[in-house]
Amino acid sequence: MAAAMATATKCMSLNPSPPKLQNQTKSKPFISLPTPPKPNVSLAVTSTALAGAVFSSLSYSEPALAIQQIAQLAAANASSDNRGLALLLPIVPAIAWVLYNILQPAINQVNKMRESKGIVVGLGIGGGLAASGLLTPPPEAYAAAEAAAASSDSRGQLLLIVVTPALLWVLYNILQPALNQINKMRSGD
């Protein structure tokens, strides 16, 4: 929704004047009305301020409400829930494909860093972040994960039934290029 609002405000700021007709004849009014004074602020500034107000109001929403609802679901049903696993299974091939495509550029980057001694700097920054605790998730994330794992309903499985045909279609479209790439790698071209 925020993206749609931002697009709308951007579109309004790109074309501030209405389109003019080519063969427009001017008519003289019977009564002359005074023209209102023009505002000093341009439309681009106004639309930017409007977008800022909308986004700031969206950013102040209460995130604790979702965690509280998950905790209530967890308290109501004490059996285990497999929704996370059911949703993860169809996504694993897509993630593996993305990682496969990222692997070679990542290896190239590491080799460039080794040549320029940049890996020492990268490890130093990573070690500093890990030592300061910036890489660990907050305890609230663990509580939300535990609450989600404790609740039990079959909505995840129903979602899986709906999503499965789309994921199968994506996998079908990925399969032939993947086989072509494997054959190219085997032939050594």
Swiss-Prot record:
Propeptide residue intervals: 118-143
Gene name linked to the record: PSBY
Source organism: Arabidopsis thaliana
Superkingdom of source: Eukaryota
Protein name: Photosystem II reaction center proteins PsbY, chloroplastic
Ranges that cross the membrane: 84-104, 118-138, 158-178
Recorded topology in the membrane: Multi-pass membrane protein
Note: The central hydrophobic segment (residues 118-138) does not form a membrane-spanning region but could serve as a targeting signal for processing of the precursor in the thylakoid membrane.
GO MF terms held by the record: manganese ion binding
